[in-house]
């Protein structure tokens, strides 16, 4: 499947380019991007035809990419829906737990932080025309031209002036704005004056010194060049050291003279000498400063002593002496042997830069130290200067001298039509190609940092070094080797020169025709088209591990051309899509200024690819945000975002770009706010594409992050209300984004009652997320709640104090009750009513009621999250608790005189809870499957509570099974547990009573405020249907009186989400021991936890000391993780690399799996025709911990058996050889056990899903090894009944529906038993099915390809449900024939999936078709069975018994065999059978016993040693 972005264009031939110029000083010598659309006259007809052909090719190439990303996603979804083996829990959030990779790609230093200009140029010409230097013997004829002018044709002085002007004009073509100064046949003083003047004016910018020494001797071996002194001698040396001093830094030198390499050598030597002097000078200064400090300290002491003794005069004399000594030390500096003694001072006066950077100066020399300049009369004498300043002219002349072309003269070469700046002319095209070729050579040869310095830092320097590459090629042919500093690798034989020669050849071959007929058509070179094709070929086969594409700089140059621009952008986008390494390369080559200026283009055909390119750039380097704001680039993306007709993928990428612009960038936030980004994002929150919704939310979150003005604008737009609607979105990423955005709205409400009310309402609204199936969403919830805690810290500290005090009092009461029970030996668990009454009536702990205020409710939610089954969630919540707990002193609490109180009274131990009644805050609405919100004011009422009601919405919390005290205790028990180290904890035999609160009415009167929370007729319907009662929380406009501690608030909740919140608050209040009535059995739960008050105090202190604690506020990394999506390939085909190891392994596994399925079909047919006569024992092994075996699961294709024991340990075995592969802990809460276990994904990646008595469903991946083991997800199956280790839900039964990714769970819940369906793709509870009986579900099974599933009950009922039917009507049929506990049910594929096979504990096995009211077949096993299994495809049934026997029979009830003994001569009797299971395909059966023995039996074996007939 090709998952790609659409970069096709329906009108490429008419695509318009940029009409705006690009002034870019940091581009490779190109000042602007011009289209010149109006210049397509008759002279360019051939160009137009070529362009049209190129556009057609572009269209053909681009159309090969998939139509749109949206279509690709639809295709992927279609393929997934039609793939019956689609893996689950394979999303990115499951692979990395929504945590960004800490090993981020290192961003290359592509941005030139020290960008500079060459602002001054000194042209020093020592020609002495008419007089040859004495040390050079010239040939005859020899080269005479200087700057393409023969000086012998003019008088010497006039020729000298003309050469100077011509050289200046040649330089001005490369840098027209520089300040040029000529010094013709100068003296030393003139050179000095010139250099100091230019340096003074240039300040910190670069100065160029061009030296032509053709009329003077060669440089000396002492580091000197020659100038003139007319007063004494003809030639006088000028030290390079002095020249360095006058020029300062930064500077660039061009030396065009014989033996110029000597100058380079001495220049570097002097630079090193200067560095050593500067280091010595700095060291002296340091020593002097230290001496000054010591002397100053000593003087101060002496002053103090002398002032005491009256010896002032002596001290003053000493100070004077010290001052004189310091002055003499500071003035003592060393000067070099060659140069002025004031060189350091001169350098400082001439340059503000440090002389230590002399080695960083750039030098270009015409030849090496032992070479002389070429004297070929066909070329100018200053060939090196010609190469540097007129590269095209000298290149054409050199090419003709080496070409077989005839009829081309030098005069013809000088008359090539066009100009250098017009790319549509022959001369301009040659210059354009030359720039691309030299850039490409430099890019592929030079190190990246050197390329950046020489080709991207300075416009003039870049031009000179491009031309220097040509000089190396031309002058080497004349046995002359140019030298540069920094030294470059050899480039004169690079392959790109051949492409340059071809382009030159094509132009010169047309030259006679073009000169003869000015109207002749010029045939453009196919150079760029061919290079783009080469780049495209590289994209097809290249990768990060291969050499980067050589044509990348050419792609950059092609962006200047309208004809090639679209194709170049598409190819560039494909290259950037390869990964962050490709983006780094593109930025280093200089792509940034080009694509930045392209944002000013109105061309619609460039929009999609420009958005994609910018998304790739910003995914790597966020620092580009300021550049975008500065160039008004954000407006481009806002315009894309504001057009609903633009494809979703482009709007998604635009939202990402805008979010990056706003990320920690106040100018970006302000610009986007002014640009009306907020209403645009809000208008698209209901977009059908979840990626659009997600990034619209994150874009808004980043816009108002720490930006109060944007927060107020969001509140005015009711953004918080609209975001609340998305808390139940079907996409977990959208829900997490909504939580992040709402969390970012929190904070900064100081002094604003309206904002305070809104923030508290938002925090209460977020409570519904605690029931979310996705750990990613719950993690973001904790972080958002931490912002509330930070904003209202004092209120939460007060709540925490009161809860801690209450727990101490409760521990005292418990100790007293235990003491009395030991004395009386009559009551072991019933508390004294009088004590409880006194606790309620006389303790000032309940007088202020702050625990049941808004802050109290939120604090209890946080405490509940401390025991979240997912570590990342629990750890963050625990850090909040630790931070708040550290704010108050435990010793102070323990010193309170609360323990010695008497006259306790339990008559009215009712929880108190203040709600929220806020003006200007808000309320929530749940209607027709959507969670609605209206945050204009709230009076939350609770009545006729319903569970559910939103489309995929989460289930309301009702945490009535755990006290806050138990929460504190369990925090320390669940932290830092290693899931790979199985524990040996034994299952406790006693369970605490399960608390129920669903029918309790909580009445609280606090400070005159009444709270009503009525739980009447909980109606849990089908969440996915519109039959639900519409839910709302009505706003009565009541005002909140927030006095800082949360008192004097009122909550009234209606049904729907309001009911969910009410249930949450009520249950949290109950779970903290603050709610309920005399029937509340909280004391029983407490008594089962501890036997003394001291243990409670120790537990609480242990929590404060053991939890990780960070003073800083929790930080969400969800945004950074979300950004990773754009760093990964987005338009690449998802087709397999058939040569990779992974592809070969996958192909092998696919063939193996098909073979296993085929062999199993044959085996099933054989069994149908001739049932097996025995099941021979294949393997036997034992669990080392000695625990009973509770569950067995065969892997469908690998020789793996997954085993769980009677506690919380899971082991993985190779059943072929009986070797244990791995063992790990399920991370249950203490005292609970694994109650169900299934395998998820028949094909890779296989995972284990477990359910335990603690009410938690866990998903494990990589279970074959501890190195790969990871908890993918975990959630509470019934979050409204959150449990601790002492009050488990009971047997939590789980079934996995692999075709649709549904998890069916049921258990012994406090209220009416139900079956809940969770959708693992959406990670939401989607349906509650009421079973219509008070008995408990013991087992479940589903048809593999349909909506039906069956459930067995503890009272013998078997019911068939249709998940398409909502609520209490889901049960479509009931079998009442069983009279005892249902051990297991099955809906085997061998019976079409429509027949239910059930087995009861008395041994009855019934076959039941749902279209009938009674069973069609009954098999009487005549034995009590403890385990029961049916083969999925073969007509085989296995029954295990506590009587140490396994019976295997067919569907007609005929016994196949009975297993009583293990194999062997002295076969031991098998233990009491606790579980049996068939292999999904093969005729294999596994059996586990209470003696920890596991046996594997093969139905194809002919052995009879273990068979009892």
UniProtKB/Swiss-Prot annotation:
Basic and acidic residues composition bias: residue spans: 89-98
A single GO cellular-component term on record: cytoplasm
Keyword Repeat applies: yes
Domain of life: Eukaryota
Record PROSITE patterns: WD_REPEATS_REGION
Start and end residues of each stretch annotated as Disordered: 1-100, 281-356, 970-1005, 1018-1058, 1072-1091
Biased composition (Low complexity): 20-67, 282-356, 1082-1091
Protein family per UniProt: Belongs to the WD repeat RAPTOR family.
Protein name: Protein raptor homolog
Provenance organism: Dictyostelium discoideum
Gene for this chain: raptor
